[in-house]
Amino acid sequence: ADDFKRFALEMGGKSASVILSDADLAKAVKGTVNNCLLNSGQTCTALTRMLVPAQKHDEACELAANAVAKMTPGNPLEETTRLGPLASAQQRDKVIDFINIGIKEGATLVAGGPEAPEGCDKGYFVKATVFGNVKPDSRIAQEEIFGPVLCVIPYEDEAEAIEIANGTAYGLSGAVWSADDAHAKKVAGKLRTGQVFVNGGDFNPLAP
C-alpha cells in the first residue's frame, strides 16, 4: 500500500440469539427482547433474530409479546418510559417500511405493527414489533432495520440453528442460551461473529 490511514468503522449487525432446546425459554426470551429493544433497537449489537426450536416457536412468540407489552413508550425523561423514539423521521419511516415488508413477506405479526404507539404523537415513535414464523432468507431477517423489531425464526435442529445464525452478511454479535454452559460455549464457537453472549453474560470492557 502507498499509505495507511487511521479510521474507525461503525459496523452493522443482524445478530442472532440462539435459544437451544434445553434452555430456560422464559429467561432466554426476556433477555433477547431486552437486548433487542435497548435504545429502541438502535444498537449495532442488537439481538434482532431470535432462533427457537420449532416445537417451542409459539410459546416463544407469546413470551416475547408479553415482554414487549411491558415496554412502555414515551418521553425518555419519564421514569416509566421503557421505549423512546427513533433518531429521526427518516429512520422512523424506514423502520415502518420494514414492518410493512415483513407483513407482505408473510411473517406472522405477533405484536406491534406500523402504527404509532398510542399517546406518542410527538417524536419519531414506532411500536415495539415482534414477527413470528420468519423465513431466514426474508428481507426482515437479512437486512439491518435498526429499530424495535424482533424476528422469531424456528429451526428443526442445532445444525440448522447454526446455519441460520451464520446465514447473513453480518458478523458483529450473537448469543447462545442453554442449560449446559459447556455446550453453549461449544455452539458459540461455531458462530461466525465477533462476540457471543452466553446465557445472558455480558462483556467487560476492562478485561484483557
Predicted features along the sequence, with ranges:
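A structural signal for short, well-ordered beta-strand elements
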Residues: 21, 88, 151-156, 177
